[in-house]
Swiss-Prot record:
Positions contributing to [2Fe-2S] cluster binding: 333, 335, 352, 355
Intrachain disulfide bonds: 338-354
InterPro entries: QcrA_N (IPR045603), Rieske_2Fe-2S (IPR017941), Rieske_2Fe-2S_sf (IPR036922), Rieske_Fe-S_prot (IPR014349)
Oligomeric form and interacting partners: The cytochrome bc1 complex is composed of a cytochrome b (QcrB), the Rieske iron-sulfur protein (QcrA) and a diheme cytochrome c (QcrC) subunit. The bc1 complex forms a supercomplex with cytochrome c oxidase (cytochrome aa3).
Source organism, top-level taxon: Bacteria
Membrane topology: Multi-pass membrane protein
Family: Belongs to the Rieske iron-sulfur protein family.
Protein name: Cytochrome bc1 complex Rieske iron-sulfur subunit
UniProtKB keywords: 2Fe-2S, Cell membrane, Disulfide bond, Electron transport, Iron, Iron-sulfur, Membrane, Metal-binding, Oxidoreductase, Respiratory chain, Transmembrane, Transmembrane helix, Transport
Length: 408
């Protein structure tokens, strides 16, 4: 506030002033000059004012509808995964778009209402203030309160109860649209799910489908053929099966060319349905799809050129994790969990397209660029007696981005 006015006002003098006088005094003390001020609707009961109020009300009501729609979608809409051909696939597909549409409608409508109210009801005003320094005095504190009261009165919000109520309700709902998604985090990541370990792990951050190796389960590196299943019904109920080839098939080393990469998923021996063991009636499609959709299951199988493989720097304690020129790294970026789905064969770098982290495949998946701070976990692999690539063990560190309980 300004210290240019030498007059010291007593409490009695300040109490004797009206709110308008205090507001005017506040502008003078603050070296503010109101160069221009015009009321939007100087005539009482102006039809244009009523139209403007209805327009603001419309956007506020629309914002409330959007907020309620978001909460209803988030709480009641069927969000569980549905595979191709499942009943309810359309509703599942629309879940995320509905969240975006309703939350966007809520926030944008409230924004439109605020902008419209300012343009239609707040008086046009041009004020000029000279810059000055100095601590605030008692008179300044009193006058700023008066200025705020004056702003409240001139905004006419005090007599527009409907707009105030709608704005308050809309603001609360807009806040809920931001807070409600955090409900998805209200889950203890260390509580195992009911039932035994399966192809998606036990539900904790420590496990994946590859953890089955620790339970003496033979786990193959399964290539995704992207085969689409068809529904058929028999005496035991509805089943899904592919024709000619299953969704996941085992891989041999010769199936991958040098300087190339393949995304593989855990394929337990009991789910194998290819080669000499192929049985068109074997019902494994849904189980294999659970493996494909496992949040920590995706692994990049990389076959290096022989010349490049000779340059590899092994991580201490993981010297035997590879099989010849074949290296298997987790496909989950250690930054925030995006899929590191790009592989540059010429530079042997693994790229995450989300935030441009880069990992050196010749240096145990060490990050060399971008925000990722930890190397990609490496899966130990080998071949079995039939020549198929299998997991020789489980990952020795948690997969994906960091979390509080990690020590590194």
């Amino acid at each position: 506030m300004s210290n240019n006015n030498d007059k010291q006002y007593t409490t009695q003098e300040l109490n004797a002033m009206s709110n308008e006088d205090l507001a005017r005094l506040g502008t003078e003390l603050d070296d503010v000059t109101i160069a221009y001020r015009k009321e939007r609707f100087p005539i009482a009961n102006d039809p244009a004012e009523k139209r403007a109020a209805r327009a603001v009300t419309f956007w506020l009501v629309l914002g409330i509808i959007g907020g309620l729609g978001f909460l209803a979608t988030y709480i009641f809409w069927p969000w569980e995964y549905k595979a191709h051909g499942d009943e309810g696939l359309l509703a599942y597909t629309l879940y995320t778009p509905m969240l975006g549409i309703t939350s966007g409608l809520c926030i944008l409508s409230l924004g439109f209402a605020v902008v419209l109210y300012v343009k239609k009801f707040i008086p046009e005003e041009i004020a000029v203030q000279r810059r000055h320094d100095g601590p605030s005095e008692e008179v300044d504190r009193r006058t700023i309160v008066a200025l705020l009261n004056d702003s409240w009165q001139t905004s006419t919000l005090g007599r527009r109860k409907l707009i105030m109520g709608l704005a308050g309700g809309g603001a609360v709902l807009a806040g809920l649209t931001i807070i409600a998604p955090m409900g998805g985090m209200i889950k203890n990541p260390w509580n195992p799910k009911e039932g035994p370990m399966d192809v998606q792990g036990d539900g904790t951050l420590w496990t994946s489908g590859w953890t089955l190796v620790e339970n003496d389960v033979k786990v193959y590196l399964g290539r995704d053929t992207a085969a689409i299943a068809e529904s058929h019904t028999d005496a035991t109920g509805e089943h899904w099966s592919t024709t000619g080839v299953s969704r996941l098939v085992r891989m041999r080393p010769e199936d991958l060319a040098a300087a190339s990469m393949e995304t593989v998923f855990p394929l337990p021996a009991e789910m194998v349905n290819d080669g000499a063991e192929y049985d068109p009636a074997k019902d494994v499609y849904e189980h294999q799809m659970h493996s494909v959709h496992g949040p920590r299951n995706a692994v990049m199988l990389i076959r290096l050129r022989t010349a490049d493989a000779e340059k590899v720097i092994e991580r201490e304690g993981q010297e035997s994790f590879h099989y010849g020129d074949y290296y298997a790294y987790s496909k989950i970026c250690t930054h925030i969990g995006c899929p590191t789905s790009l592989y540059e064969a010429q530079t042997n770098r693994i790229l995450c397209p989300c935030h441009q982290s880069q990992f050196d495949a010749l240096h145990y998946g060490k990050p060399v660029f971008g925000p990722a701070a930890r190397a990609l976990p490496q899966l130990p692999i080998t071949v079995d007696e039939e020549g198929y690539l299998i997991a020789a063990g489980n990952f020795i560190e948690p997969l994906g981005p960091a979390f509080w309980e990690r020590k590194s």
